[in-house]
């Protein structure tokens, strides 16, 4: 299955890294007008920076040596004007580039989130929640530095560099050639520093994903952690990953810190040679102090843009490492998509047909040669030992997965030939693990039923036996129920989930062990609500407690991915086959549980 592949980033080399960088720059295309204005500001700021070095010659020769009073007025005024205009350009350039960078990050994060939403369930089984969260947050943020900061430095510092090089060649081409000998020596170390930084950045992002996954697991599973007294163990696991992240961060700082002194050392060699030769020229009388110091000022001013350009390579490498991971998801083609000629599925009126289907996950067979017809309005329960394939079979109907072979039809329409939205609008789901959102009770009930009225929400809550406890909450229907509904009991969460399904009013209903985790009192209230929900609907029940499916129209027994029996409850018991064995096994377990309960009391 295509969707079973993970989103592990490929290893990119040479031209591929350049392609990624170009792809990042293309994200700025919609912002071309702002980028053009920012670029003009950067060019002006770069030119004005180099003009300061140009003014050193007239300042020294005309003011201090020739004592020209007129120049004493104009040069200070020119310097003030240069700094004023340069400051304004730098401000507007920073604001514009920051907007472009943040806008690109927001758009990229939206694209990434939308792409994740398109993936099938197999994608999520391959990619932990924490890793995906890290991609959307940390990896996307690393791209922002490349798009705005690195591009700004490349444009502004490169132009400043060109202007300053022009000044030093204009002032003394012989000294300029001596200075230029040093620059080629920097190319190799810059490349090596960049390679190391990219490697560390990739490892840092992987470790950050692992840390986020660990954090998400332990916080969501905090009850189990405490129940099994594993706090110390989890603290150690977190500390190990955190320590690894700290060492990688220090390594990144070390690489950055080492690159600057190395460049300073090479620059120092060049400046020492220039002072020796330039001083000799002044002593000999073939040059003036103003010319030499103008040259030297331009050369010293070259240091900062060169330093930033060496560091910008590290920023780019960090961004490319993050982009590899982000694009590895954005470029994934979802398994489950609408066909070009997909049609709308009418409301079910006849039957669901499952024709000779098979399904494999990672080449491991899960379902084999399943044939089943479910009439509209029929209640069909699926039972079997854990791993028998009952949940997988039911998940194929809303196309959470696609069949490996065979077909599923609703009223004669192959579900692969209809649009996903029209298919899934026909299906309501209530699961054992109730998923609620950190929002109000009202919005959780109305989830997926946009435009419904307050009256409809309350009617759905009443039908789900939820209205009475809702009105007793602090804010009633406006009460925010916490992450995953943690402020509510299991039975209360389940009844809100049932109210949500009632409000959706879908003709097909999937109940995935909806009462298996509830106590007896809560189960009775939920079961009553479920019976109202099931009325008049085609219902597929994944059952754990066989006592809850006695009244099903038909019970389907799956063993190792195959249907071995089907029929009504009493009929299957009379056959003394697999269903009878399951019933007897559960009856014994229930009896033992009752005995233990009596002894405890």
From Swiss-Prot:
Disulfide pairings: none
Organism: Syntrophus aciditrophicus (strain SB)
UniProt keywords, alphabetically: ATP-binding, Cell inner membrane, Cell membrane, Lipid transport, Membrane, Nucleotide-binding, Translocase, Transmembrane, Transmembrane helix, Transport
Membrane topology: Multi-pass membrane protein
Gene of this entry: msbA
Domain ABC transmembrane type-1: 36-318
Reactions the enzyme catalyzes: ATP + H2O + lipid A-core oligosaccharideSide 1 = ADP + phosphate + lipid A-core oligosaccharideSide 2
Transmembrane segments: 35-55, 77-97, 150-170, 173-193, 263-283, 286-306
Name of the featured protein: ATP-dependent lipid A-core flippase
InterPro entries listed in its UniProt record: AAA+_ATPase, ABC1_TM_dom, ABC1_TM_sf, ABC_transporter-like_ATP-bd, ABC_transporter-like_CS, ABC_transpr_lipidA, P-loop_NTPase, Type_1_exporter
């Amino acid at each position: 299955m295509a969707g079973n592949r993970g989103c592990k980033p490929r290893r990119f080399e040479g031209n591929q890294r350049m392609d990624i960088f170009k792809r990042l720059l293309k994200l700025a295309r919609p912002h071309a007008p702002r980028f053009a204005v920012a670029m003009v500001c950067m060019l002006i700021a770069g030119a004005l920076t180099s003009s300061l070095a140009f003014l050193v010659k007239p300042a020294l020769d005309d003011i201090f040596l020739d004592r020209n009073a007129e120049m004493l007025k104009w040069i200070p005024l020119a310097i003030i004007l240069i700094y004023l205009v340069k400051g304004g350009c730098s401000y507007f350039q920073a604001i514009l580039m920051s907007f472009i960078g943040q806008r690109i990050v927001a758009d990229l994060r939206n694209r990434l989130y939308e792409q994740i939403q398109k993936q099938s369930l197999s994608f999520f089984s391959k990619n932990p929640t924490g890793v995906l969260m890290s991609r959307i947050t940390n990896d996307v943020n690393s791209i922002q530095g490349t798009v705005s900061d690195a591009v700004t430095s490349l444009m502004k510092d490169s132009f400043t560099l060109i202007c300053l090089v022009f000044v030093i060649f204009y002032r003394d081409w012989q000294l300029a050639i001596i200075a230029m000998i040093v620059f080629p020596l920097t190319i190799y170390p810059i490349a090596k520093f960049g390679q190391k930084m990219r490697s560390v950045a990739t490892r840092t992002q992987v470790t950050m994903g692992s840390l986020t996954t660990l954090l998400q697991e332990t916080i969501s599973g905090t009850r189990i952690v405490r129940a099994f007294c594993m706090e110390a163990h989890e603290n150690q696991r977190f500390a190990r990953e955190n320590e690894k992240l700290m060492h990688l961060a220090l390594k990144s700082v070390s690489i950055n810190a080492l690159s600057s002194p190395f460049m300073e050392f090479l620059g120092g060699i060049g400046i020492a040679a220039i002072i020796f030769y330039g001083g000799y020229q002044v002593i000999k009388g073939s040059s003036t102090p103003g010319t030499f110091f103008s040259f030297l000022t331009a050369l010293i001013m070259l240091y900062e843009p060169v330093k930033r350009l060496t560091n910008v390579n590290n920023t780019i490498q960090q961004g490319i490492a993050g982009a590899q991971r982000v694009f590895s998801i954005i470029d994934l083609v979802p398994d489950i998509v609408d066909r070009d000629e997909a049609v709308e599925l009418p409301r079910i009126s006849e039957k669901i047909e499952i024709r000779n289907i098979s399904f494999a996950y990672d080449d491991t067979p899960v379902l084999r040669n399943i044939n089943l017809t479910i009439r509209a309005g029929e209640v069909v329960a699926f039972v079997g030992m854990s791993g028998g394939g009952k949940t997988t079979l039911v998940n194929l109907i809303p196309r959470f997965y696609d069949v490996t072979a065979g077909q599923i039809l609703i009223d004669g329409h192959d579900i692969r030939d209809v649009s996903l939205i029209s298919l899934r609008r026909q299906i309501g789901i209530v699961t054992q693990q109730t998923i609620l959102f950190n929002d109000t009770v009202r919005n959780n009930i109305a989830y997926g039923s946009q435009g419904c009225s307050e009256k409809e929400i309350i009617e759905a809550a009443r039908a789900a036996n939820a209205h009475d406890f809702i009105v007793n909450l602090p804010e009633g229907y406006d009460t925010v129920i916490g992450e995953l509904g943690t402020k509510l009991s299991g039975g209360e969460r389940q009844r809100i989930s049932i109210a949500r399904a009632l409000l959706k009013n879908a003709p097909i209903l999937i109940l995935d062990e909806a009462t298996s985790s509830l106590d007896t009192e809560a189960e009775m209230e939920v079961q009553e609500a479920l019976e109202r929900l099931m009325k008049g609907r085609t219902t597929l029940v994944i059952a754990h407690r066989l006592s809850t499916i006695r009244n099903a129209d038909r019970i389907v027994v799956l063993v190792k991915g195959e249907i071995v029996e089907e029929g009504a409850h009493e009929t299957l018991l009379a056959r003394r086959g697999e269903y009878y064995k399951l019933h007897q096994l559960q009856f014994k377990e229930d009896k033992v549980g009752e005995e233990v309960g009596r002894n405890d009391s």
